[in-house]
């Protein structure tokens, strides 16, 4: 019960904070009062073996027929806060049930999950889901689906796989064309011929250079990343730390 109530209070206070009508101290006082009231109300009405039992009693609801939820109104009264300064949506329902906290923004829209406690959660994961739920409740994200767990998450960036067995990059499906690499602009740290790029064919290396790689077509975008760079033994003409850090950002 503690985690579910804390999540509901965190969700409400995030909505209040986004409205920017109350000070930080007022929000903290309101959150403390709301949590205390919810613990008092839900004690004796919490059934982990049957989460749906007492669901209507535990829900926090605001709509056109009842524009002030009794629990929120009491928390405002005990913390000396104007209810309408909370800036909550005109139609919103929050269900605080064992193992799950859900919300519905609008009476005719589908509910979505704020947090589910059926598995283990890290603090940052919970905060991310609550933040996304706040965005949905304030209209920043689409609210037509029943779950938004993936709608506000970032896609993982994958480094393509390369064919060099010495390369540190071993991710699948390298299909990117090599043509753009032959049109890179000249960089200051490569002007003296100390560094090498596949695109160096556009800029001749000075004759004084004692060693350089042939400008043949490469099948490995990261062929310059090899064991020598990480063992500290860099061959003449191989890119140094400055060139390495610059190229890895591309």
From Swiss-Prot:
Single GO BP term: negative regulation of mitotic cell cycle
Q: Name one GO cellular component term.
A: cytosol
Following inactivation of the gene, the phenotype reported is: BTG4-null mice are viable, have body sizes similar to those of their wild type littermates, are healthy up to 1 year of age, and do not spontaneously develop tumors. Females are sterile and their embryos are arrested at the one- or two-cells stage.
Q: What is the effect of changing residue 107 to A?
A: Loss of interaction with CNOT7
- What happens upon changing residue 45 to A? Loss of interaction with CNOT7
Q: In which tissues is it expressed?
A: Expressed in oocytes. Expressed in testis and in olfactory epithelium.
Among SMART domains, the record links this protein to: btg1
Task: State any single GO MF term.
Answer: mRNA 3'-UTR binding
Q: What mutagenesis or variant effect is reported for residue 51 to A?
A: No effect on interaction with CNOT7
Cite the record's note on assembly.
Interacts with CNOT7 and EIF4E. Interacts with CNOT8.
Tell me the protein family, please.
Belongs to the BTG family.
Please give the function described in this protein's UniProt entry.
Adapter protein that bridges CNOT7, a catalytic subunit of the CCR4-NOT complex, to EIF4E, and facilitates maternal mRNAs decay during the maturation of oocytes and in the fertilized egg. It is therefore required for the maternal-zygotic transition (MZT), zygotic cleavage and initiation of embryonic development.
Identification of the protein by name: Protein BTG4
Tell me which species this is from: Mus musculus
Per UniProt, what is the name of the gene that codes for the protein in this document? Btg4
